[in-house]
């Protein structure tokens, strides 16, 4: 379906001066109101520390809160410590027409900082005022049906009014004043709905009329050449395509001789985009024409976080999302309406006896209207949430050391299975893991692992198994580090596994075997990778052969960092496990001695038998 978008801009230029004669509401509280061509305006002058609030009353006396509302044509503006302005269109909510005059009842209340209402009173606004005649306003006709999607350029002419009627359009739109704003001499204001004056007074010194406004004049035109004479600081126009027709239909200027042929002109340009953004561009020349400084221009309802996206000496650019920067959103039928205002703060010059300003009050009302029933493609991007921030404070670290039944590490011995029985050189499958941690970025790091003959990790003698996370080089049966299964384990970095070849500890002085059980211990910590630090340990592949012997293993870590095996590892037959040495040599000599004695006895018996047989044979021969 076609994409519909309507843009209406309201450009208000007013001086912060009085409107007509002030009327006393109560002591210290004054107001005045005036009637314009399209609406009425009420000015209230509060006392210090008072905040003015408005409510409108219907024909039955019911009160309704007043807010900036384009549907009801109600607008409230205020100047700090000066005055508060309530503007209402003759077509606005609760404006009643009686005998050719428009009536609006307004309830005014002044609220103190503590929330207490200080002053309150009803005021009835009647336009035109009773002593003036009414001139019919041809602009009060109902708006026409919006046209299909076509980018247009709007020309603005100054008229003494504060409401704009716009033709429907979509896409990229430029509004520009055809004439400079003129500060007219004070004159009686327009006293009822009627057409704009055909002449504009010449510039003279004096006070300013409260409203000098602009209205949409033409649709489908592009900027005149004089608006495209930008001396320096060209800003490329945000438009799809590079043709001259596309550029000019977007309300921008085109010059094929420039590096960026399509650029913004000396005017105010509003662009509404399907992507959910609007772009508002104002030139320095336009700001000076309306008596304001470009540095003081900002979005009226935006917080401090919505500064201009681009600012030069010649232009100020706002490119912001439709849903941010204080933009009001309304749904009317099948239309989505986004509204905001571009305003300028006045530059106040303070002297010893008072203050002055030479700036006008500038207010540009911007509105983007989209057809809510249109179908648009949507592209969704799903971003995984960031992992939680690492915990930096100290706390307990729960570790567990357990022994697996086989090299698959699929099952483990329970507490009742200890002490385990192993023969020399049989493998023992050891695993250390983190408990009660679900942070996938944590890495378990083993520092030292060792064995002792008792349940005390500080008992002597000791034998190192891992040194600084690597297999101890002095072992002729090097400990084998086993990589954790990344697919089978939910947090594989929380595990460290290695395989030990069983051994017996020797006494450091006598070198005799310490018959008994062996206990395993490890010191560990949890590491969080940061930058280039991956928490991994790089080990040297060199092998140094050395006979196991008990030595002092320096343990300086806190007890909370040390984890031990649930039980000991023992041996089935100590005699079978006797290491090679003097006792083994003694047994061999004994066997050899017994064998020698046996052979000697056998030889003696054999010799004796032969001797006896020889004697008998000799005696037989003699006789």
UniProtKB/Swiss-Prot annotation:
Region entry Disordered, spans: 182-201
Recorded GO CC terms: collagen-containing extracellular matrix; egg coat; extracellular region; plasma membrane
The P-type domain, residue ranges: 226-266
Family annotation (Pfam families): Trefoil (PF00088), Zona_pellucida (PF00100), ZP-N (PF23344), ZP1_ZP4_Ig-like (PF22821)
This protein's UniProt keywords: Cell membrane, Cleavage on pair of basic residues, Disulfide bond, Extracellular matrix, Fertilization, Glycoprotein, Membrane, Pyrrolidone carboxylic acid, Secreted, Signal, Transmembrane, Transmembrane helix
Annotated positions of the Pyrrolidone carboxylic acid modification: 21
Record's comment on post-translational modification: Proteolytically cleaved before the transmembrane segment to yield the secreted ectodomain incorporated in the zona pellucida. O-glycosylated.
Membrane topology: Single-pass type I membrane protein
Domain of life: Eukaryota
InterPro entries documented for this protein: P_trefoil_CS, P_trefoil_dom, P_trefoil_dom_sf, Zona_Pellucida_Domain_gp, ZP-C, ZP-C_dom, ZP-N, ZP1/4_Ig-like
One Gene Ontology molecular-function label: structural constituent of egg coat
Bilayer-spanning residue ranges: 591-611
Positions annotated as propeptide: 547-623
Biological process annotations from GO: single fertilization
Cystine pairings recorded for this chain: 228-253, 237-252, 247-262, 449-470
Reported tissue expression: Expressed in oocytes.
Subcellular location as annotated: Cell membrane
Domain called ZP: residue spans: 271-542
Ranges in the topological domain labelled Cytoplasmic: 612-623
Leader peptide range in chain numbering: 1-20
PANTHER family the record matches: ZONA PELLUCIDA SPERM-BINDING PROTEIN, ZONA PELLUCIDA SPERM-BINDING PROTEIN 1
Similarity comment: family membership: Belongs to the ZP domain family. ZPB subfamily.
UniProt domain comment: The ZP domain is involved in the polymerization of the ZP proteins to form the zona pellucida.
Record's function text: Component of the zona pellucida, an extracellular matrix surrounding oocytes which mediates sperm binding, induction of the acrosome reaction and prevents post-fertilization polyspermy. The zona pellucida is composed of 3 to 4 glycoproteins, ZP1, ZP2, ZP3, and ZP4. ZP1 ensures the structural integrity of the zona pellucida.
Oligomer and partners: Polymers of ZP2 and ZP3 organized into long filaments cross-linked by ZP1 homodimers. Interacts with ZP3.
Protein name, entry field: Zona pellucida sperm-binding protein 1
Organism: Mus musculus
């Amino acid at each position: 379906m076609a994409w519909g978008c309507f843009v209406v801009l309201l450009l208000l230029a007013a001086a912060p001066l009085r409107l007509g004669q002030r009327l006393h509401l109560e002591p210290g509280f004054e107001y005045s109101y005036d009637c314009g061509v399209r609406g009425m305006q009420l000015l209230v002058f509060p006392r210090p520390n008072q905040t003015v609030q408005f409510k409108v009353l219907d024909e039955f006396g019911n009160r309704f809160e007043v807010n900036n509302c384009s549907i009801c044509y109600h607008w409230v503006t205020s100047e700090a410590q000066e005055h508060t302005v309530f503007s209402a269109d003759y077509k606005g909510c609760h404006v009643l027409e009686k005998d050719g005059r428009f009536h609006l009842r307004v309830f005014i209340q002044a609220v103190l900082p503590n929330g207490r209402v200080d002053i309150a009173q009803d005021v009835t606004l009647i336009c035109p005022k009773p002593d003036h005649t009414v001139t019919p306003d041809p602009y009060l006709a109902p708006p026409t049906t919006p046209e299909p999607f076509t980018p247009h350029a709007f020309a603005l002419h100054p008229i003494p009014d504060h409401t704009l009627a716009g033709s429907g359009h979509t896409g990229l739109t430029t509004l520009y004043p055809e004439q400079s704003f003129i500060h007219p001499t004070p004159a009686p204001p327009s006293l009822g709905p009627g057409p704009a004056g055909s002449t504009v007074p010449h510039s003279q010194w004096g006070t300013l009329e409260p409203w000098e406004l602009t209205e949409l004049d033409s649709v489908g035109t592009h900027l005149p050449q004089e608006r495209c004479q930008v001396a320096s600081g060209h800003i490329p126009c945000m438009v799809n395509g590079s043709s001259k027709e596309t550029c000019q239909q977007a309300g921008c200027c085109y010059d094929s001789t420039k590096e960026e042929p399509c650029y913004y002109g000396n005017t105010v340009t509003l662009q509404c985009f399907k992507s959910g953004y609007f772009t508002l561009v104002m030139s320095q020349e336009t700001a000076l024409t309306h008596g304001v400084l470009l540095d003081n221009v900002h979005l009226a309802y935006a917080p401090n976080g919505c500064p201009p996206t681009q600012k030069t000496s010649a232009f100020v650019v706002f490119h912001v999302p439709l849903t941010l920067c204080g933009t009001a959103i309304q749904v009317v039928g099948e239309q989505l309406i986004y509204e905001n205002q571009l305003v300028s703060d006045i530059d106040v010059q303070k002297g010893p006896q008072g203050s002055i300003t030479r700036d006008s009050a500038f207010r540009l009302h911007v509105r983007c209207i989209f057809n809510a029933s249109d179908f648009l493609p949507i592209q969704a991007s799903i971003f995984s949430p960031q992992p939680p921030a690492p915990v930096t404070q100290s706390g307990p670290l729960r570790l567990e050391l357990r022994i697996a039944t086989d090299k698959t590490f699929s099952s483990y011995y329970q507490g009742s299975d200890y002490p385990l029985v192993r023969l020399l050189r049989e493998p023992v499958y050891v695993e250390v893991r983190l408990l009660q941690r679900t942070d996938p970025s944590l890495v378990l790091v083993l520092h030292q692992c060792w064995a002792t003959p008792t349940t005390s990790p500080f008992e002597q003698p000791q034998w190192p198994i891992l040194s600084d996370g690597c297999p101890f080089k002095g072992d002729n049966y090097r400990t084998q580090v086993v990589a954790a299964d990344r697919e089978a384990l939910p947090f594989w970095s929380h595990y460290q596994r290695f395989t030990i070849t069983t051994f017996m500890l020797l006494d450091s002085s006598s070198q005799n075997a310490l018959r008994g059980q062996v206990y395993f211990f490890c010191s560990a910590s949890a590491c969080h990778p940061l930058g280039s630090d991956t928490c991994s340990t790089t080990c040297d592949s060199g092998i140094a052969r050395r006979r196991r012997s008990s030595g002092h293993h320096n343990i300086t870590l806190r007890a909370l960092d040390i984890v031990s095996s649930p039980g000991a590892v023992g041996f089935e037959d100590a005699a079978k496990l006797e290491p090679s040495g003097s006792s083994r040599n003694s047994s061999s000599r004994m066997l050899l001695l017994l064998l020698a004695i046996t052979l000697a006895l056998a030889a003696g018996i054999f010799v004796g038998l032969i001797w006896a047989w020889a004697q008998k044979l000799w005696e037989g021969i003699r006789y």
